[in-house]
Amino acid sequence: RIIDSCTYIIGGTGRVKNVIDKNGTHILSPRLTDGGLSITDMGSKIIYDCRTVPVDGDGQYQPTSGFGQGPAVLMVQQDAVEFVLRGRNVFYGFIVACDPWLKAGQTCFIVDEQGALIGHGLAQCDADEALRFRKGIAVRTRSDFSKTFK
């Protein structure tokens, strides 16, 4: 639904460099190193707004969850919100809940306890680790929402 009306910027080698939505907003770019997608701050907002399922807050890990319903969402405690908004990484001890399809190396969205998007980044763990570990970096953030959404 999002990419139906998008335009693409093609580089000199014939590869897609950027994906632009119908309003002219750069929403994502392919990563050549691993084939993943780098989502921009505005792109994360657009994609997150299309989400229809709530974050699974029961804390139960489901190893057979598969691909899920889009990029996984990770919910953090209120204490971590101001740091994530400024582009700081998410540490395990501050995670409240996450989608069961969270996988290491994949893009995920970071939300506060009310479900408001506060950042996005690359997960360093799967859902089981996110809910069980207490020390270390769970998500390396790729945004500074405090500057993007003033």
Question: Language model features by range: what are they?
Answer:
Residues 1-150:
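Polybasic, low-complexity RNA-engagement segments
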